[in-house]
Every structure is written in C-alpha cells, then in structure tokens.
Amino acid sequence: MQKMRTLGEFIVEKQHDFPHASGELSSLLASIRLAAKIVNREINKAGLADIIGASGNDNIQGEEQQKLDLYANEKFKAALEARDQVCGVASEEEDEAVAFNKELNKNAKYVVLMDPLDGSSNIDVNVSVGTIFSIYRRVSPVGTPPTQEDFLQPGNKQVAAGYVIYGSSTMLVYTTGNGVNGFTYDPSLGTFYLSHENMRIPENGKIYSINEGNYIRFPTGVKKYIKFCQENVPEDGRPYTSRYIGSLVADFHRNLLKGGIYLYPSTQSHPNGKLRLLYECNPMAFLIEQAGGLASDGVHRIMDIKPTELHQRVPFFVGSKNMVHKVEEFLETYPD
C-alpha cells in the first residue's frame, strides 16, 4: 500500500519548483494550513457557539459582516504575521491593506490577498463555505513597509493561490504554477493528506452554475447562453444541468471535479459584476488555468487585468475551456 503523503511532506518535495526557492514560500503555505485548521474547528462547532449570524458591522463593500468572517480574518492575519514570510495582507474584510510592522516582516518577500470566509452567510444553514488566498512576491524594496503596488499586481504575477473548502470533509486545494493538488483533512490526526493529485477539469462540462433568479438583469449574451444550456440537443450533451450553491468555493470545487462553468456576470445593479478581482477571481483563475480550464470577464483573460483598486469587481466566467469560449462567443454576438 502506497504511503499517504501529508501536505507538509508534499510542500517540501515540491519546494524546488518555486523560483528562488529558499523555504519561505513553504513556510508561508504552512501558516495557511495552520489557520485553516483553526477556522475549520470553529466552523464545525458554529451552531453550538455564539459565532454565527451577523456582527452588526458592514465591510467596505457595504455587505453585512458575519461573525465568523471576522474570526477567520483575524486568525489568518495572525498566522501569516507570526512566520515572518509575509510583509502585509489585503483582505476582503479590511478597508485597506494591512502592513505587518515587525522588523522581520518588513524583510519578507511576499504579500497575501485573501477572502477569509467566502459564503459565510450560508453557515447557519450548513452549506459549504471556504477560504480563498493568493500569494505574490512584493515589488517594493525588501526592508521597507509594503506599498499599494505590492497588492495591485495582475493575476499573472501570482506565485501561488488556493482555497480551503469547509464541507462534508475539509479540503485544501492549491497551485504554485505546476499543476493543482488537493489535500483532505483528517480531523482525528489534525493532518491534511494528498487525496487529489494533479487535478484536471474536463474541456467540456455538463453543469452551469449561475443565480438564475437574476435572469432579467443579465446581459443579452448571458441570457442567450443560458437558453443554449437548456436546449434539448442530446447529441451535444444538452440540456446541461443547473447547479448553484451560492458559495463560490463550493460551486468552483464541484465544477473543477466534474466539469462545468460558473458565471457571475454584470447586472443592471452591478455593472462591473460583484466578485472581487483580487480576492476571488485572480486566485480561482490561476487554479483553473493550471487545471486546464479558463477564466474570463467575458472579453479578457482574468489574470491579464491590471487592478486599479483593492476592492475592484469584475464579471466572472470560469470553468471548462470550451464552455468559457462559448459564453464569450455569445457575449460578442449579443453586445448590449
């Protein structure tokens, strides 16, 4: 029987894949692993503790912050600061980027951008939620505080990205630009084990994931694509199946494994889309491309978009390569 590899062992094995390998990125990923375990523990007992429901505060996007959002945000910040590999973080839950002021942190080479708890409004109904993270090498001089430019880098500059999905089992999925690998958490041992090696998304899928309750507000091209998905064309594998959980990590994870497309287009009320380029779209785009899929805003490759602000939003289409190409065709054919 083949020995099961832990996340820690796998990271060490793959360390030579990292440019300028020095062990720092390995240690940074270990910090994320630790914070994920802590957050997973709290999520699993959320119904028994006073940490579900809203905190009474809004984040910078004007969205009501959930108590676990804030808890996860603090735990990930603390874990990342403690190891001295990160000079600062930008979080969906913070108005501005946070610089770590310890001298060792100023000498760190990396910044982290994160959505500490995606889909947190679903916790009280026991739906899967997740953490999304993105890692960049800083562009400002080492030894100085991080600058805005360190965080406003296009997705094609990411050195690592991933997510943790807290569901029926907890998984950590990540890439460093050399494929995508998934690790399942064994709570009895407190260890992540390699369970999904070299994950690949099928070029064609049969699942489309979109909140069809907003159909009337969608661009014409997206409406036409939805009708295309629903057409009865058995020789082409249609109609496709509609599956939408409302938690990006959960919808993305299913489509990565099964093949499919996730769509969050612009609407009349959100002309730039609703998902955040830096905290959600870029890391998911890096993962999907490494798994053989595509991510687009309907016109441009997501990872080629140059960010102009920390909380920038974009339309988002991500998943199986041929499905993303098809929705781009509809958007080009039916411009609004």
Swiss-Prot record:
Record Gene3D superfamilies: 3.40.190.80, Fructose-1,6-Bisphosphatase, subunit A, domain 1 (3.30.540.10)
Top-level taxonomic group: Bacteria
Localization terms from the record: Cytoplasm
EC number of this enzyme: 3.1.3.11
Membrane-crossing segments per the record: none
Binding annotation for Mg(2+) 1: E92, D115, L117
PROSITE patterns: FBPASE (PS00124)
UniProt keyword Metal-binding present: yes
Keywords annotated in UniProt: Carbohydrate metabolism, Cytoplasm, Hydrolase, Magnesium, Metal-binding
Enzyme class: hydrolase
One GO-annotated biological process of the protein: sucrose biosynthetic process
Stated family: Belongs to the FBPase class 1 family.
NCBIfam families per record: PRK09293.1-1, PRK09293.1-3
PANTHER family: FRUCTOSE-1,6-BISPHOSPHATASE-RELATED, SEDOHEPTULOSE-1,7-BISPHOSPHATASE, CHLOROPLASTIC
Matching HAMAP family: FBPase_class1 (MF_01855)
Protein name: Fructose-1,6-bisphosphatase class 1
Organism: Vibrio cholerae serotype O1 (strain ATCC 39541 / Classical Ogawa 395 / O395)
Gene expressing this chain: fbp
